[in-house]
Amino acid sequence: MTILVVTGTGTGVGKTVVCAALASAARQAGIDVAVCKPVQTGTARGDDDLAEVGRLAGVTQLAGLARYPQPMAPAAAAEHAGMALPARDQIVRLIADLDRPGRLTLVEGAGGLLVELAEPGVTLRDVAVDVAAVALVVVTADLGTLNHTKLTLEALAAQQVSCAGLVIGSWPDPPGLVAASNRSALARIATVRAALPAGAASLDAGDFAAMSAAAFDRNWVAGLVG
């Protein structure tokens, strides 16, 4: 059994499509997969990341906890809605209930690693420590990514959360000079597990499955579950 938290260097970097792609690749490798998104914001505009994972990857074991209408950071979205954030033990219990032998459990955060997900001030990093998870970091290939990536990795290391690698959430075609340079530099910081093509979320399920299988190394995916 393996719990992998999927975090990112910020909002809009492609965490959901990466969750879906890794889930699809794992399922094609014969691995049982569950996906958890403890906190979802932006529901008033139709944001539903778990439904997107289900549509793209065919995962049926999907679990969420708190949903807030406005597309804001969870604490701000909760305050705006007159609601509370979940408690730390609620999130931990949600994840623990999914975890089982032979299963890969993916836990998608909201925004970046240190965004508050639970009261008081609990972040995805704290949850990762609680459930003994490793982290996959979704990054961009844009200017600023090297600094943002290093800051995220330093924050993980500060609490002894292992990094399973990086995934570029949206890889342009063709890549420009900056993207190509940053991809090489990112690979010197940590292992780049995949670079998903820009617009991958718009693919149908069949094309998405083929893309996902090609994007990730099958041996690495198979080795995620011991």
Swiss-Prot record:
Mg(2+) binds at T16, D49, E108. Keywords: ATP-binding, Biotin biosynthesis, Cytoplasm, Ligase, Magnesium, Metal-binding, Nucleotide-binding. InterPro entries: DTB_synth_BioD (IPR004472), P-loop_NTPase (IPR027417). Its main location: cytoplasm. The keyword Transcription does not apply. The active site is at K37. One of its GO terms (biological process) is biotin biosynthetic process. This is ATP-dependent dethiobiotin synthetase BioD. The gene is bioD.
